[in-house]
Each structure stands twice: as structure tokens, then as C-alpha cells.
């Protein structure tokens, strides 16, 4: 049985890790290098590193920070934010990333997924989708959740997987930062639509939320969170022990 993954997410702005609620009002949390090392040493299965200003302001990723994070950690690193071209993939991978997450860049140019999958392999291409309900329909938002694309989220995810995305991070804007649990309805719809690994993001507030996620939706491969880990509300080692007690397969 494939073990489930617990993945802390570092949202980085101006070289610091920040975490807002519903993408508004950012608080400075810490240094990405310090936090990355802490998670690598304390049970995280992977790390996700987003430059959250990159897509909106067209800013290139902070490659110096990225190199330091990659040198410091011993777990797989996924990097996103401002990935718009194959050159962006190349730059990030050369800095030590294992996987590259594409969001707004794929919305602008879906062929980017196909080109990157062909060049680097689909295991390297992660589709990140910010999804919000609009009139009861799961809708894709771009530019860090600020711009309604009008696209149906399930159809978009299916299209991108067909193009070569090897993994999907589904971030529910409705539940992000609210700490009332993952968006199970949205995640179930995605899991039913595609066969690649699905990572749940947005809404974790407690260990129980992860237990519920993996019990209710066995098809979900990983749970991703930021603030509950950054503020030490949930300890990853303890979380994984708790999940293992519930017979959820974990790498301890």
C-alpha cells in the first residue's frame, strides 16, 4: 500500500515565509531556509515552496533562497510561483527542485504542461489549481486566487492531466486558512476525475482533519498545510503517529 504524505507548504514573499487567511493579510512567519531544515529534520515527507508574488507581479523566483533551501533539506522539494516557460522549469530544477508546480502559467499556455512533461517527465510536472465555488460550480482562479477565469475546475484538471501533469495540488480558496477541515466535496470530485496523485490543500486545522481526509477519501495521496505547522499547532511526527494508529499508511 502506498504511504500517504504530509507536506508543509512555504508561501514566500520578499524572501520570508508568510501565511495569510483566504489569501489576504499576510503575516511574516519565518525564514524559508530555517523552516525548510526544521521540516526536513522533523518528519515531513516533502516540501512545497511557492513564491506567492511571482505570478501576480511577474517576478522571477528568488533563486538564491531556493538553492539554499535545496542544499539544506533531504526530502523532495516542489517549487512554484511565476513558472511561465520551459526556461523557468529549467532554472528551478537547476536550483535543486525535484518537481515544478505550474498554475497561472498553464492557464495562459496549457501547452507548457505538455512541453515540460515531454522534456522532464510527467513525474516532474505538478499542476496547482486554486478552486472556489462560484454559483455552486467549482471554478478555477488565477493569479494567487485573485482572478476568476470562469473555467470549470474539474474539466481543467482533466485536460491538464491528459497533457502530462503527473500530480495535482487542489487548493480550496473557500477553506484556505479557515482551519475547519479540508474541502472533501471538491477533493472527491477531483479524485473521481483523474488517476494521478491528488494533494489536498486548504483548510487543515487539526490532526483530526487529516484523519478525516484520508479515511473519507482514500484516493487522496497527500495532505498539505502551512499555518498549523508553521505555528506549531500540529507537530508532523505526532500527526503521522496518530494517522498510523488509524491504520493510515505512513512513513514514520
Residue ranges and their predicted role:
Residues 5-9, 46, 74-78, 99-101, ...:
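Structural preference for beta-strand elements that scaffold enzyme active sites
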Residues 11, 39, 47, 79, ...:
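Conserved, mostly hydrophobic/aromatic
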Residues 12-14, 18, 97-170, 174-175:
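Conserved anion-binding
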Residues 46-64, 104, 169-180:
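Glycine-rich, proline-tolerant flexible connector loops at the mouths of alpha/beta enzymes
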Residues 53, 62-120:
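Glycine/small-residue-rich loop that forms an oxyanion/phosphate-binding "nest" at active or ligand-binding sites
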Residues 57-78, 115-130, 180-205, 247-248:
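Alpha-helix-loop-beta-strand connector modules within alpha/beta enzyme cores
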Residues 77-78, 83-96, 185-220:
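Catalytic cores of alpha/beta
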Residues 91-112, 172-177, 200-207, 216-236:
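Glycine-rich phosphate-binding active-site loops on the catalytic face of alpha/beta enzymes
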Amino acid at each position: 500500500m502506498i504511504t500517504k504524505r504530509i507536506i508543509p507548504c512555504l508561501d514566500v514573499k520578499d524572501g520570508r515565509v508568510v501565511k495569510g487567511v483566504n489569501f489576504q493579510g499576510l503575516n511574516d512567519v519565518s525564514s524559508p531556509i530555517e523552516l525548510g531544515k526544521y521540516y526536513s529534520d522533523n518528519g515531513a515527507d516533502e516540501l512545497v515552496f511557492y513564491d506567492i508574488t511571482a505570478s501576480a507581479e511577474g517576478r522571477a523566483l528568488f533563486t538564491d533562497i531556493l538553492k539554499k533551501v535545496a542544499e539544506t533539506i533531504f526530502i523532495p522539494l516542489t517549487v512554484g510561483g511565476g513558472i511561465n516557460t520551459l526556461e523557468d522549469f529549467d532554472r528551478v530544477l537547476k536550483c535543486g527542485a525535484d518537481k515544478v508546480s505550474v498554475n497561472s502559467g498553464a492557464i495562459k499556455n496549457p501547452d507548457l504542461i505538455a512541453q515540460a512533461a515531454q522534456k522532464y517527465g510527467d513525474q516532474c510536472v505538478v499542476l496547482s489549481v486554486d478552486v472556489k465555488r462560484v454559483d455552486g460550480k467549482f471554478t478555477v482562479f488565477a493569479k494567487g486566487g485573485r482572478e476568476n477565469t470562469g473555467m470549470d475546475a474539474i474539466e481543467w484538471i482533466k485536460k491538464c492531466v491528459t497533457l502530462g501533469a503527473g500530480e495535482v495540488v487542489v487548493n480550496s480558496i473557500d477553506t484556505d486558512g479557515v482551519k475547519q477541515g479540508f474541502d472533501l466535496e471538491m477533493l472527491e470530485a477531483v479524485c473521481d476525475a483523474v488517476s494521478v496523485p491528488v494533494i489536498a490543500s486548504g483548510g487543515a486545522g487539526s490532526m483530526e482533519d487529516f484523519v478525516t481526509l484520508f479515511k473519507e477519501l482514500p484516493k487522496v495521496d497527500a495532505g498539505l498545510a502551512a499555518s498549523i505547522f508553521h505555528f506549531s499547532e500540529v507537530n508532523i511526527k505526532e500527526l503521522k503517529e496518530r494517522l498510523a494508529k488509524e491504520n493510515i499508511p505512513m512513513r514514520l
